[in-house]
Each structure stands twice: as C-alpha cells, then as structure tokens.
From Swiss-Prot:
<feature type="active site">
    <location>
        <position position="432"/>
    </location>
</feature>
<comment type="function">
    <text>Catalyzes amidations at positions B, D, E, and G on adenosylcobyrinic A,C-diamide. NH(2) groups are provided by glutamine, and one molecule of ATP is hydrogenolyzed for each amidation.</text>
</comment>
<protein>
    <recommendedName>
        <fullName>Cobyric acid synthase</fullName>
    </recommendedName>
</protein>
<dbReference type="InterPro" id="IPR033949">
    <property type="entry name" value="CobQ_GATase1"/>
</dbReference>
<dbReference type="InterPro" id="IPR011698">
    <property type="entry name" value="GATase_3"/>
</dbReference>
<dbReference type="InterPro" id="IPR047045">
    <property type="entry name" value="CobQ_N"/>
</dbReference>
<dbReference type="Pfam" id="PF07685">
    <property type="entry name" value="GATase_3"/>
</dbReference>
<dbReference type="InterPro" id="IPR027417">
    <property type="entry name" value="P-loop_NTPase"/>
</dbReference>
<dbReference type="Pfam" id="PF01656">
    <property type="entry name" value="CbiA"/>
</dbReference>
<dbReference type="GO" id="GO:0009236">
    <property type="term" value="P:cobalamin biosynthetic process"/>
</dbReference>
<comment type="similarity">
    <text>Belongs to the CobB/CobQ family. CobQ subfamily.</text>
</comment>
<feature type="active site" description="Nucleophile">
    <location>
        <position position="334"/>
    </location>
</feature>
<keyword id="KW-0169">Cobalamin biosynthesis</keyword>
<feature type="domain" description="GATase cobBQ-type">
    <location>
        <begin position="253"/>
        <end position="440"/>
    </location>
</feature>
<keyword id="KW-0315">Glutamine amidotransferase</keyword>
<comment type="pathway">
    <text>Cofactor biosynthesis; adenosylcobalamin biosynthesis.</text>
</comment>
<dbReference type="InterPro" id="IPR004459">
    <property type="entry name" value="CobQ_synth"/>
</dbReference>
Amino acid sequence: MSAKTIMIQGATSDAGKSALATGLCRLLARRGVKVAPFKPQNMALNSAVTADGGEIGRSQAVQAQACGVEPHTDMNPVLLKPNSHTGSQVIIQGRAIGNMEARGYHGYKPVAMKAVLASHARLAAQYQCIVAEGAGSPAEINLRDGDIANMGFAEAVDCPVILVADIERGGVFAHLAGTLALLSESERARVVGLVINRFRGDPSLLKTGVDWLERHTGKPVLGVLPYLYDLHLEAEDSMGLDKPGGAVGGGDKLRVAAPAAPRVSNHTDFDPLRLHPQVEFTLVRAGQAIPPADLIVLPGSKNVLADLAWLRAQGWDEALRRHLRYGGKVLGICGGLQMLGKKLHDPDGLEGEPGSGDGLGWLDMETTLAPEKRLTRMRGRLTLGDAEAAGYEIHMGVSQGPALARPAVRFDDGSADGARSEDDQIFATYLHGVFDEPAACQAILRWAGLKEPEALDYPALREANIDKLADMLERHLDLEPIRRWLPETR
C-alpha cells in the first residue's frame, strides 16, 4: 500500500488548518478510506502521549481520533516545545533529543527532514491516504531556506496542497492572492484549491470576490466554510492562550481561576472546566489580579523555575497564600505540582539555566529534573471519592518527600501519584487530562465546594465536535475538483 498524501497549508497562522485537516480526516474515514494525519513539524506546548510511548502535538492526537486510529509518533515526527524566547526542546519521533536555540535548529533541519520523510514513508506503507498539515504560512520568506514544515515537505513527497485563509481576520483575498504570489512557480503549481474559512452571513454576498479570486489565481475555491459557533477542539499550540480571555459563566457557580505564566504547557487541561455549565472559569494573565475563587489551578510549565519567578513577580504567590488562608483550594498539575513543593533542582539545565530554586513550600517534597522524560498513559482512581481517572504524564521531574505519602491518585498498576496536603486544601498530580473523565471532574469540583456537580463527558463532547466539523465539510467543501488526488471512496 502506498498512500496518497494531500496537504493543508494556511495563508496565516490560525487560519483553520488543524480544524480543516481534522474534519477531512473524519469525512474520509466515514467513506471507508484508511486515513492517517501527519504534521511534519509542529511548535506546540500542548502535546499528547502516544500508544508507542512518545509525544506528539495535541492536534495530531485529535486528528488520529477523527481517523479512528491510535495516535503514533510518526504522525508528528518533529515537535518543538518552546522553553525560552529563542529556544525550544526538540522532540524527534516522540523522543526529546535536547534543547536548541533557533539558529542552531536551523542547521539541524536537514537531519530533522530525514526523520520527517522516514515517518511519512512508514505511514504511507500502512494507509490509503495521509492528510498532512503545514505550520504557519508557506510564504514566510525568512523561513523558506531548508523548510521542512510546508512547501519543503510538499515538494519532497510531491503532494498537492489546499490553501486555507480565515475571513474572520479580514483581508482574506489579499492573504490568499499574496501567499500564492510569494511562492515559487513549482510551489504555486501544486496548490490545487483554495478554502475560505469562518465566514459569517450569506455566502452569496461573497460571490463576486470568489469569482475574482478564481480568475486572478487560476485556482478553484473549494469551499466557503461557515463560522461554527460552539465548536470546541483542543488548541494546537502556545498561541491558543493569546485569544481573548476572561471569565466564562457567572451566577451560582464554582469559581475557578488559572494563572497563565509565559511557558504554560498543556493548557488543554482547562478545557473541561471552560465548558462545564456549573463553573465560572477565569484565565488570569500578566498584570491581572487573581480574582476571588473557590479553586485555583496551577497548570503545567515548560520552564518551571522561570515561570515560578514570573508568578512571584506578578504577586500571585501572595494571592495564593491569602486564598489558602481563607479556606480556598489549590490544584497543581505537573509543573504546578512541582511549584507547590519546597525546592526545585535543574542541575543539567534541562529547562533553562542550571540551578535550584525555592518552591512555594506548601507540600513537603522536592523535585529534581532528570534527562529521561516520563511519557505514559495511566488509568486509576483519585483518592477523592475513589473516582475513576485517566490521563497521561509528560515530565522530566522526579519528586520525592513525605508529602507523597498522601497521594492524589492510585493507578491500576499499583503505583501512586501526587500529593494531598494534610489540611486537604491542596491536591497535586502529574496526571494531565485529570478533568477529562466525568467522575474525576465531578469529584474534584465537589472537593472544591460544588455541592452537586453535573457530569460533563468531555471525550464524548470531543467526538461530537469532530462529527460537527465533518458534517459541515460534507455540506460546504467541494472535493470533486481534487478527486484525482484522493483515494476512491464508497
């Protein structure tokens, strides 16, 4: 079997590449095509653990679900996790190989490209179709040399490209026409269709613009996709937090606040809280005060010591101290757990400069970062009401100390995780996705003060949203002009 590959590229970041790829994966799977997702290179702080014990971007895990297959490290062979303004942890085929500054990584790209092509070849041997997703824009002039994320990959595997742009941002015709104008002749030739995303209103009002675009570019517009209200899919990368924030909900609800430090990771952990009908969720940003809350969640971090210093500079440590003094609850996840201990040690400089620092000191434990990253999926039960829990661990920290004698989770394999404070105000765990299971989410909300929490089935909600995307594409995306680049469907 040798798969056909079709690639989704965007005229800008956040144009809708991930959503279009996800919907197309489900649409093809519905039609009996054995399909897999692929993203050559991803820069993301939201990641997922695969069945083969590696790490990929969160969007590729969701796209694998859309395909009805298990996520695999070959689906995102290069993952960059920013840990400073100029550097990232580099993950190749699911495994961290070290930290690199941007200039150093540029020289490493030929090696990364070999991994990209090897992963693609393995998937191509197993599937009928690969839906690949680009990163950012293919027309970034300063990134064209040695590109492995967009047209560099498309040229290497000789695949067609669909170019998508977001009309919600304005300037959609300039984005599409301008992107095509900046491509080389061979790159422009492999663009087989254009998509206008997130249009509100009557699409007939756009007809003159679409007609002009097709005449000007010589490319068919495959669809004008409507704005989907109440569509909830996990954000792909660190840019997800740059969207407008603030409180969600109100009235007689549990108040949950989450301080967002610069290197917050896996903030998809918050999604079930954002969507829960009985939760008023507030993402607290730089310069803002932590509002009155029943529960404060300290999320994961790609640089715990740096984010903890930043948290203190915001005065949030004092706000947390007051919150606990007046009976509030605090939940730490992964890096948040490490912050709650007495000491943090990074002797090898795995996340930043080598060194040690004081934690917040509310749990009697210390954490040392070690080169071997723990990547695993786990199932078990919370020590809160024996509620069933499931999720994944992604961390380099090894935590030790008396606080761990009161664990937060007991896993099915007999191991334990995390800590609960003796006064039961603090719950800390390495388990990402701890709110995803309905019973676990209910137990935590009850512990935080909500008397009768409703069950929110977040995995079922994700599945319904994938179907919602595919249903929309069935109605609004014309695949006929690109039929020859797709496998036969039933």
